[in-house]
Amino acid sequence: MASGCALHGGCPSDYVAVAISVICFFVLLSRSVLPCLIHKAPRTNSSSFWIPVIQVISSFNLLFSIMMSVNLLRFRTKHWWRYCYLWAVWIEGPLGFGLLMSCRITQAFQLYFIFVKKRLPPVKSYIFLPLVLLPWIFGAAIIHATKPLNDKCHMGLQWTFPVAGLHALYVLALIAFTRAVRHVEFRFDELRDLWKGILVSATSIVIWVTAFVLNEIHEEISWLQVASRFVLLVTGGILVVVFFSISSNQPLLSQISLKKRQNFEFQRMGQALGIPDSGLLFRKEEFRPVDPNEPLDKLLLNKRFRHSFMEFADSCYAGETLHFFEEVYEHGKIPEDDSIRRIYMARHIMEKFIVAGAEMELNLSHKTRQEILTTQDLTHTDLFKNALNEVMQLIKMNLVRDYWSSIYFIKFKEEESCHEAMHKEGYSFSSPRLSSVQGSDDPFYQEHMSKSSRCSSPG
């Protein structure tokens, strides 16, 4: 029979295991929080925010419950909060490993419907996740009712292998969803990350179950008790860090900006997807004359005018309408036969502008919003047509008239005039007769310099 620290906890290896698990959790916490702080990622109410948060919570539950249930720490007195069924059954099971795997299965479920079925999942994540967790809850309730645990929180063989089978069942479910999306040509390595997650979780479960079985069955061997619980906690710590690090969520943030192999960051989904002429306005962007009498939808095709109008709208706290127009405009540049990129862009627009609580939620009619959210084809060319019509009406009613009299339009016209003047000067200096004239010999040199400095000065 095991005795001493092997029985009551507090062996040197136990404290080493606790220290390793604490380090693992802080690494996990830093990997989940720091990227959001560095890149100033906006908080949303969508699953892309809550699922990673739940993963962090379930990881903490898993590590802390293992530490409490296998007697790693020595406590002089028996406290009510050391109740075996609280830690070894409920928190380690449904609220630990079960919740961690359920989050991953939910992500795979979303990928399946979005990229294979080409529509949003029929069940919301906040409903699907508890449904996936139900087998763990039922299993924990049965164990709690039958009370097979002894005073050391150990259960016999008749319970050990069914519990191990429940762990394996969730890995098999993840494999099933991953096989269903294996033919999709993902842009941000989601499929590879899913397979990595399966490999890591399966390997961890094999090691974990082996240590768990040895810990449960051979209670009389002291060194085996100490070694098996050390492996249990350390493997759990490694599992949660690696599992969280392999993220198939929010590709624009976690798959692009945070990859060390990337030499630069993409600020927009259009840039990440390789949409031509996407992103910030370049200073050498060609000026095209703007006629205020032209239709607004035609004027907005002028990139410089659109960005000037967008700055004005942002100053009026109504910039979401112009940002939506630009994102939809870029979405329209993707070829119709490129369904994967169209789905990425459509999903990005939905999460940014359409869903309730979005970063730049638009003031759309309920009918239009539901048409988009319940579409049966995320690749449809007219997916955002009605929403765009409503947005254009809002722009015309609330922004256009004020823009023509704003400082932003005056600045735009000044830049346009300067560009035209510089363009004409460029033609005159390109003649062979004046090509060899130096600045100091040119009687109009000072005048050219003053015009150039005034036109090129940032304003």
Swiss-Prot record:
Residues covered by region (Disordered): 429-459
Tissue: Expressed in hypocotyls, cotyledons, guard cells and root and shoot apical meristems.
GO function terms (MF aspect): G protein-coupled receptor activity; GTPase activator activity
GO CC annotations, alphabetized: endosome membrane; nucleus; plasma membrane
Compositional bias segments (type: Polar residues): 429-439
GO biological process, one term: response to glucose
Modified residues (Phosphoserine): S428
Places the protein is found: Cell membrane; Endosome membrane
Topology term for the membrane: Multi-pass membrane protein
One Pfam family recorded for the sequence: RGS
Segments forming domain RGS: 295-413
Phenotype reported upon loss of the gene: Increased cell elongation and longer hypocotyls when grown in the dark. Longer primary roots when grown in light due to increased cell production in root meristem. Loss of stratification requirement for seed germination. Decreased sensitivity to glucose and abscisic acid (ABA) in seed germination process. No effect on ABA inhibition of stomatal opening.
Primary location recorded for the protein, binned into one broad class: membrane
The keyword Acyltransferase is annotated on this UniProt entry: no
Assigned keywords, A-Z: Cell membrane, Endosome, Membrane, Phosphoprotein, Signal transduction inhibitor, Transmembrane, Transmembrane helix
Domain topic, free-text comment: The C-terminal domain (249-459) is able to bind to and to accelerate the GTPase activity of GPA1.
The name this protein goes by in its record: Regulator of G-protein signaling 1
Lineage summary: Eukaryota, Viridiplantae, Streptophyta, Embryophyta, Tracheophyta
